[in-house]
Amino acid sequence: ISYAIDQGINFIDCANIYGTMDNRANIGQSEIILGRAIKNRRDNLVITSKVCSSIGSGANDSGLSRYHILREIDRSLKRLGTDHVDIYLIHAPDDRTPLAETLRAMDDIVRSGKARYVGCCNFPAWKVCQSLWVADQLGVDSIVGIQNPYSLLNRRLELEMFDLLTEMELGMMAYSPLAVGLLSGIYQPSQNPPIGSYWAQHLDQFTKQMQANEGQVIETLIKLAQEISKTPAQLAQAWILSRPEVTVFISGSDSISHIEDNIGAVGWKIDSQIMKELDEVSASFAT
């Protein structure tokens, strides 16, 4: 984390549910680790956290009720060692709780100074539109941006969401830009996934995807990246940043080399012919 900040990265995404080693038994640990890393550097960073996911078996241990939201923001701030997050995100829709109750609670958090802005994750376009309308009717702080998956292998946001983002001037945080590593260059359709990797543990699904359109996208990405002396991960993520609707992509890094690879996705533009090839080969994932 410190190395990433030293290289100029200033946006770090977190959540109350995130633990270590993807183990939900360790929930909250990511915020604790992040809090230690950003100590004395907080003012130069944009930090997010999230609320909704289950953090226990109790009746108030999940969802978007006022009780859960107000309790979890305090817990997140304590773990992060800060008095505010820059964007507090609704992690997922909660059909059990009235949207008005959720938005009022989020507004209270902004008014109290515990968050600067409010956003949402994993909402379809109609739900974002509904949230904007309800917030307007209530006269409360509205969402300023969304966080949804977007990549060469998942372009569904282009159907409705992108037009909404442009019209309402909302920010877009694209997560899973490498499609769980499929676009990283580590995986190739003609080869078995590396032993111990995520897709080696999901071999049947991997094989099925590589025989479909995913395999063609990956082969094209690798070929084009080689032609311009970039890595597949850099090209895949630069393609995301080329979209005017996208504000930032969120990419996980397990090592300094991964951080350096991700940083190599910014600061340059993709040639129009390469853009055309990537758009065409991945067109089926925009439907």
Regions found by a protein language model. Name each.
Residues 77-97:
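Active-site groove signature of glycoside hydrolases
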Residues 18-22, 54-60, 258:
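A short acidic, helix-capping loop that chelates divalent metal ions and anchors anionic groups
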Residues 1-4, 64-80, 128-133:
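Short, acidic/polar
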Residues 1-45, 287:
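N-terminal binding-site loop/beta-alpha segment at the start of enzyme catalytic domains
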Residues 5-6, 35-46, 77-81, 110, ...:
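Acidic (Asp/Glu)-rich catalytic clusters
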Residues 55-70, 91-97:
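Active-site mouth loops of central-metabolism enzymes
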Residues 93, 97-286:
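Beta/alpha (TIM)-barrel catalytic core signal, keyed to glycine-rich beta->alpha loops juxtaposed to Asp/Glu
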Residues 12, 85, 118:
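Glycine-centered flexible beta-alpha turn that most often forms the glycine-rich phosphate-binding loop
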